[in-house]
Amino acid sequence: MEWKGRDVISVRDFSKGDIEFVLKVAERLEGELKEKGSLNYAAGKILATLFFEPSTRTRLSFESAMHCLGGSVIGFSSAASTSVRKGESLADTVRTVEQYSDVIVIRHPMEGAARLAAEVTEIPVINAGDGSNQHPTQTLLDLYTIKRTFGRIDGLSIGLLGDLKYGRTVHSLAQALALYDVELHLISPELLRMPGHIVEELRDRVPVHETTDLEGAVPELDVLYVTRIQRERFPDEQEYLKVKGSYQVNLRLLRKAKENLKVMHPLPRVDEIHPEVDGTEHALYFRQVFSGVPVRMALLGLTLGVI
């Protein structure tokens, strides 16, 4: 498939072959970056980052990735400083920014915002998170981290823990993992179960186990992917208070785990992983942060047609 000009909106738009290709390009770029320090593939190209929601890792990692490719970055990190406050529509904002840039990365609280942006522009659009819907670039860096750690994705038993109802990272990741030969364990409070339509889709492809019992599931897992319970996604404060602090990954829990279990987290965390886990061989979440740069370099380079 032609990558130049391609939008990156949802993992549903990717085949397993597409994913594997991105991971190979990312691995190559990681090696080149370590060897040369900086690259010039995107010299003269401009990335526009449109972040209508707060972000630390995703925004900085895209900016770092573009700089590592030799390109430039413009954009904003809050809608408060833009004409959106004056009532400008998302479509008009995106059309305006298109005139200044070669590729757009957008994060927005509205589901479907990234696809809308892609429909009104001629340049590639990359989804950095749209509401509780999708976060495809996080998924790709998660898969990259798993593959670089285990040497494979097929054959692994992977648990997704926490807010599976509103968490866009786990929605995207589960759908991508279903393209592989894996076993999925969906671990959450009853109120935060994975949406039924996603579970049905997963069951058509891979074995899926739903449970509220973290301690019972942990001994089976190769990877435990932890998510925070996101207060900002709850329409009702009382619903949030019922599930707040439902689980914590700590050393006591990890004594029940396989020796080579890896704990992942898209970050930020609150109290769902105790800091005592950070210094163990189980902790993989800061390696995940690093993976964001080569993976996003690959996506930017491919969609710009410079790699």
Where are these regions (language model features)?
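Structural/interface elements that position substrates and couple domains in central-metabolism enzymes
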Residues: M1-I307
